[in-house]
Amino acid sequence: MCGIIGILGHEPVAGQLVDALKRLEYRGYDSAGIATLEAGHLTRRRAEGKLKNLERRLEQHPLTGTAGIGHTRWATHGKPNETNAHPHASDRVAVVHNGIIENFGELREQLKHQGFKFESETDTEVVAHLVTREMKKGLGPVEAVAATLPQLKGAFALAFLFEGEEDVLIGARRGSPLAVGYGEGEMYLGSDAIALAPFTDSVSYLEDGDWVVVQRKGAEVRDSAGHTVQRPVIKSNAAAFLIEKGNYRHFMAKEIHEQPEVVGHTLAHYLDMTNGRVVLPEKLPFDFRTLQRASIAACGTAYYAGLVAKYWFERFARLPVEIDVASEFRYRNAPYSDGNLAIFVSQSGETADTLATLRYAREQSQHVLSVVNVPTSTIARESDLVMPTLAGPEIGVASTKAFTCQLATLACLAVAAGRARGILSEADEHNLVRAFVEVPRLMTEALALEPTIEKLARDLAKSQDVLYLGRGTSYPLALEGALKLKEISYIHAEGYAAGELKHGPIALIDETMPVIVIAPYDRVFDKTVSNMEEVAARGGRIILVTDPKGAEHASVQTLATLILPEMAATVTPMVYAIPVQLLAYHTAVIMGTDVDQPRNLAKSVTVE
């Protein structure tokens, strides 16, 4: 994940900027840079690779300014090199950016026609030029940013530094986190409190849609409508590094809300958004074209991510996939054909059963690919190819952002397989990449349902049993929803394929039974409506998670209908996961359980 820092100080800030960026290294990065005001003039130092390269550059060409911004970058638009490293500048403004500007292509062409010259391949440079365009109309820095933000589509965090403005930083947040730090006559902006910890423990977290004008005397926060608002200043414990919830009551809530950002970063890691392509390592240790089958092994939530991936691989790549929970797979003595692909999914990369299955697959001459959140883990080290998820540290035991990042990674892998095997055309790939790019925005819109879901959880908390139903890729999501609810609320819940309702679960339906139906409007929607009618006829209380067309065509009375935006079918598991997670979370809060550390469960299961 990218990291952002901004400082208004009294002494030269270059060293402080680099120190803060070091605290953000855990997010991952491939280049870094800072910009300061030197006698009022914007001056940048940038470098590809690790921060030590930037430090060398600063030793050779020091900066002495007392106002500055800094950034660590994961490449999204454009290669990881010095030219594409942040900050980006245009005339009187420098900007650092975390996230994805979805409409950057359209804006870039518009700006080119107006005579703006681009040095980089990034979407960030578009933002710098847009602000410059507004300032050329006679607007000041604050007004120029206010005019620019509505032109941007996507999920992002931004920090601006302006030439000649020694006492102004401007930050903006939409979908990606940004915090304001308060010091003694000094002020700070940062991706999180971890970056700000060396300087201050007084931190205010911007809410989604907020933007802030920072001066040494304080900060003025405005919401998306431009109204001045107050955001509480809290004492941060970020000196303990990751033990920091921000404004959230639990880590799980924080991690649910981080998903637009981290899924965006994960997708960006595997996508060439400029050319509409999925990008994997240039030399794979196997050839998709010669594979006869693939297998997937995982545990818990990671297993459900693998179940979704099975649908994708079989649809996009016409590649048969066998999947099982690792604790079963490892003891089945399953027959393998030499030279096929074995995929292992694990948040920690240390899950014992998954690791044991990996070793068995290696003995059977399989190509081993892992999808992990810890690229230095044992599973990663023992794999032929590692595809990291960029979820960042996940503290809550119940997985949320790691799950959706696993889905994002596996989706990209399935599309790459389909392209390599000649099943997907170039146009198909472009369409899928466009759909993937929209996921962070769609997730942000899904999070807006939280107040409604919180009210609904009050009803769910009264239940002893809950049933989840889904078809297609919504079936694994039903399983995941049931797992989340039972993990953290301790309410018994089961997930079923909707078509299996009549083969047993229907016997449990009565007027006390909530039935959560995950059903975007797709080719099997009418079949799912038939199952809902069977539930309604027996008094079951239906909670429908769907889209506008689904809500319109569902001819069944529901206890509640949660309506998500219309989206491509491929991305529904990533986006529909959010209301499922929120429903479990708020039910658990009402039940008074230990949400982040539910009884009897551990984050990383390293025993068999």
Predicted features and spans:
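Acidic/histidine-rich
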Residues: 152-186, 456, 461-487, 522-524, ...
